[in-house]
C-alpha cells in the first residue's frame, strides 16, 4: 500500500500533491461552545459526608471548573481554536456587548465568554468566578422560569455563524441535569428540535453531558434524543452519552473532565478514500486513524521582537540567484546529478518518476500472526475503518512511497483478555521493514541467572504489576510537556511560574517498599550467596591453574604437516595434458575440488560431476 507519513515527506513535492501529516490533523481548527444550565438543582451543594472522595462542589461549579481547565489547555496547546461559554436559565440576559441599552433577543441566555480565541482576560475572569467565587454581576442567579431550549440553540447558532463560519469542526457542549426542560409542552419540544436540526445542517455537532443526582437518573429519551441529531451512517461509530453522577462517592468534576476529554480532539482521518482491495474486483473504501501519537512542544508561529511591541511574523520563501535577482517559480527546474552532470526534468517528467501506481491497500496473502516478529515494528500502526465522507481527512498523495504492512485484528474494548482496552477494536495496519531497515546485530547469549534467583524475582515482578497487569498511557501525562505548558500559561496570564510539577511517572517508593521490601531483601541475600559461591569456585580454579603452570611440561612430538593437495598447483598446460591423456579421473576428490576452487568454479558435487566441470573448463579456457 502507499500513504504519506512522518518519515516520507519530500521537500521537493509539489504543493498540490502534499498530504497533511500528523501535525495537520492534530492542530485542526476547532470551535467549542459550552452551554451550561444555571438552575436551582445545579447550584445545590452536595450533602455533607465523611467520604474522602465525595463531591464538594455543586454541579454548576464543577461544570465551570471543567470549562476553565478546558480553556487552559486550549490557550496553550491549540492556540488557534475558539472557545466560548453560554449560560442559560439565568435571571440576567446578555448577548455580546449590546449598544444603546438594547435588551437581548435571547431571554435567560447569558453569553459569559464570546466564541473566540481565549485571551488572558477571559481566562482571568473565568478563574475569578471558579476559584475565588467572585460574581459581581450576579450571573449565577437562576431565573424564575426555565429558559427556552429553542432560544438557547438559536443563540448558539448565531454565535457559530458569526464567529466560526468556516471552521471544519464546530461543537456545542450542553451540561445540564434537567432531562425534561419543557415537560409535556410539545410545541416547545418541536421548536427546539427544529433549531437542533438547523445546527446540524450548519455542521455543528451537539454533545450532551448529563448530570444525574442521587435517586434521580437522567433519562435522555424524554427530550434530548430529538436534540442530539445523529446521522444514521455514522451512528455505528458514534460515542454513547455518558452520565456524570453527583454525590455518589465519585468526583463529579473528574467525571465531567473525563467525559469532555474523550471528545476534546475531533475525529480526523490520517488518510481517507483509500481503496481496500480484498480480492480482484472486490474493493471497499477505508479511512485510517492514528490513535496514539507522541506530543511535543511545537512552535506554532514566529514572533518578531524588533519593534516596540511583539508581533506575529508571516514567513515566505523567495528564491534568488547569484545576481540577486528574484527567480520566478516557472523558471525553476528540477535536476538530478548522474555521473557528475545534472540531468534536468520537466515538472510532468519529475512527477511521473514519483508516481508508483494507484493508491490502494491490496491483500497479497495470509500468514499466521506467530510469524510476525516483535522487532518488525518500524512505524506507528494505523487503525482503519470503513466509512463514508463524514470526517475531515487527507487523501494519500500520488507520490507516496509504497510500503508493506501486516493487517492485524485487535480485540474488543470490553474483552477481558484485551491488553489495550483504551484503543478501538478492528483492523490495524502494522508497517513492516524492508531489507534496508533491518540491521544485522550480533548479540552474545546473555548470562543465565540461577533458577532460585529467577523464582524470587518473579514474586517481586508480580507484586509490582499495574492494575490488571496493564499500562494505560492516558494516566501518565508527559511531565516535560506539562511543565512547558505550565510555564507558557504563567507567562500568558502574568502569574508566578510554579516551583514544581506533579510527575505521575515518578515511582511510588513507599508503596514499592511496602509491597516487595521483604522480597527484595531475600533476593539480595540469595544474590550475595550465589555470587560468593561463584567467586570461591573461580578462586579455586585459578589456584589449580597456577599449580599446573609450575609443573614441567611433558615433551610432545611435533605433528607432521598435512600433505597439501597437488591439484591447486597444476598449470594450464598440465591440465591440458591430463585431459588429452584421460588421467583426470585418476585425481582424488580433494585434488579436483582444489583445482576447481583455484579456477573460480563451483566445487560441489560427486567425483564424476567434478571431473565433468573440470573438463568443460579446460575445453573453454585452455
From Swiss-Prot:
Catalytic function, reaction form: ATP + H2O = ADP + phosphate + H(+)
Residue stretches making up the SAP domain: 584-618
Domain of life of the organism encoding this protein: Eukaryota
Keyword vocabulary terms for this entry: ATP-binding, Chromosome, DNA damage, DNA recombination, DNA repair, DNA-binding, Helicase, Hydrolase, Nucleotide-binding, Nucleus, Telomere
Protein name, entry field: ATP-dependent DNA helicase II subunit 1
CDD domains given in the database record: KU70, vWA_ku
PROSITE patterns: SAP (PS50800)
Stretches assigned to coiled coil: none
Any one cellular-component term (Gene Ontology): site of double-strand break
Domain Ku per the UniProt entry, residue ranges: 276-463
GO molecular function annotations of the record: ATP binding; ATP hydrolysis activity; damaged DNA binding; DNA helicase activity; double-stranded DNA binding; telomeric DNA binding
EC number from the UniProt entry: 3.6.4.12
Comp. bias (Basic and acidic residues): 1-13
Primary location: nucleus
Family: Belongs to the ku70 family.
Amino acid at each position: 500500500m502507499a500513504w504519506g507519513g512522518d518519515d516520507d515527506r519530500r521537500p521537493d513535492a509539489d504543493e498540490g500533491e502534499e498530504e497533511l501529516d500528523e501535525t495537520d490533523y492534530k492542530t485542526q481548527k476547532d470551535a467549542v461552545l459550552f452551554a451550561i444550565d444555571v438552575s436551582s438543582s445545579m447550584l445545590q451543594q452536595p450533602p455533607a459526608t465523611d467520604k474522602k472522595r465525595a463531591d464538594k462542589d455543586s454541579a454548576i461549579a464543577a461544570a465551570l471548573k471543567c470549562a476553565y481547565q478546558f480553556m487552559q489547555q486550549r490557550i496553550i496547546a491549540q492556540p488557534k481554536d475558539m472557545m466560548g461559554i453560554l449560560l442559560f436559565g439565568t435571571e440576567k440576559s446578555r448577548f455580546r456587548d449590546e449598544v444603546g441599552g438594547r435588551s437581548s433577543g435571547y431571554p435567560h441566555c447569558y453569553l459569559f465568554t464570546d466564541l473566540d480565541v481565549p485571551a488572558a482576560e477571559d481566562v482571568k475572569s473565568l478563574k475569578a468566578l471558579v476559584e475565588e467565587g467572585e460574581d459581581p454581576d450576579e450571573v449565577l442567579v437562576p431565573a424564575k422560569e426555565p429558559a427556552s431550549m429553542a432560544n438557547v440553540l438559536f443563540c448558539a447558532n448565531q454565535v457559530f455563524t458569526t464567529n466560526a463560519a468556516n471552521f471544519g469542526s464546530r461543537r456545542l457542549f450542553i451540561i445540564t441535569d434537567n432531562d425534561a426542560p419543557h415537560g409535556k409542552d410539545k410545541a416547545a419540544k418541536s421548536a427546539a428540535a427544529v433549531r437542533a436540526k438547523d445546527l446540524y445542517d450548519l455542521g455543528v455537532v451537539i454533545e450532551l453531558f448529563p448530570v444525574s443526582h442521587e435517586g434521580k437518573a437522567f433519562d435522555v429519551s424524554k427530550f434530548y434524543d430529538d436534540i442530539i441529531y445523529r446521522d444514521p451512517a455514522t451512528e455505528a461509530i458514534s460515542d454513547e452519552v455518558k452520565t456524570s453522577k453527583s454525590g455518589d462517592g465519585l468526583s463529579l468534576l473528574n467525571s465531567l473532565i473525563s467525559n469532555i476529554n474523550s471528545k476534546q480532539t475531533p475525529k480526523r482521518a490520517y488518510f481517507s478514500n483509500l481503496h481496500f482491495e480484498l480480492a480482484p474486483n472486490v474493493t471497499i473504501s477505508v479511512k485510517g486513524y492514528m490513535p496514539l501519537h507522541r506530543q511535543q512542544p511545537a512552535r506554532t508561529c514566529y514572533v518578531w521582537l524588533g519593534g516596540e511591541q511583539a508581533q506575529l511574523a508571516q514567513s515566505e520563501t523567495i528564491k534568488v540567484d547569484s545576481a540577486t535577482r528574484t527567480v520566478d517559480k516557472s523558471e525553476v527546474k528540477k535536476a538530478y546529478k548522474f555521473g557528475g552532470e545534472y540531468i534536468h526534468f520537466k515538472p510532468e517528467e519529475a512527477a511521473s518518476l514519483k508516481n508508483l501506481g494507484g493508491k490502494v491497500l491490496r491483500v497479497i496473502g495470509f500468514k499466521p500472526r506467530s510469524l510476525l516478529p516483535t522487532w518488525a515494528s518500524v512505524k506507528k500502526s494505523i487503525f482503519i475503518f470503513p466509512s463514508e465522507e463524514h470526517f475531515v481527512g487527507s487523501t494519500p498523495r500520488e507520490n507516496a512511497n509504497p510500503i508493506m504492512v501486516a493487517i492485524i485484528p485487535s480485540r474488543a474494548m470490553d474483552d477481558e483478555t484485551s491488553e489495550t482496552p483504551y484503543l478501538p477494536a478492528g483492523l490495524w495496519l502494522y508497517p513492516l521493514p524492508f531489507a534496508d531497515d533491518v540491521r544485522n546485530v550480533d548479540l552474545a547469549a546473555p548470562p543465565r541467572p540461577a533458577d532460585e534467583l529467577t523464582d524470587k524475582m518473579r514474586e517481586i515482578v508480580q507484586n509490582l504489576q499495574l492494575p490488571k497487569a496493564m499500562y494505560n498511557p492516558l494516566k501518565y501525562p508527559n511531565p516535560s510537556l506539562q511543565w512547558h505548558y505550565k510555564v507558557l500559561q504563567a507567562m500568558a496570564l502574568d502569574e508566578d511560574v510554579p516551583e514544581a510539577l506533579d510527575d505521575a511517572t515518578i515511582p511510588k517508593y513507599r508503596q514499592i517498599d511496602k509491597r516487595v521490601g521483604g522480597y527484595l531483601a531475600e533476593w539480595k541475600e540469595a544474590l550475595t550467596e550465589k555470587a560468593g559461591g561463584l567467586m570461591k569456585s573461580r578462586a579455586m580454579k585459578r589456584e589449580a591453574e597456577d599449580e599446573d603452570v609450575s609443573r614441567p611440561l611433558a615433551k610432545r612430538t611435533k605433528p607432521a604437516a598435512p600433505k597439501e593437495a597437488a591439484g591447486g598447483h597444476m598449470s594450464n598446460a598440465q591440465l591440458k595434458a591430463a585431459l588429452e591423456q584421460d588421467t583426470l579421473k585418476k585425481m582424488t576428490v580433494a585434488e579436483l575440488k582444489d583445482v576447481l576452487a583455484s579456477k573460480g568454479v563451483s566445487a560441489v558435487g560427486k567425483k564424476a560431476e567434478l571431473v565433468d566441470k573440470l573438463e568443460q573448463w579446460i575445453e573453454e579456457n585452455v
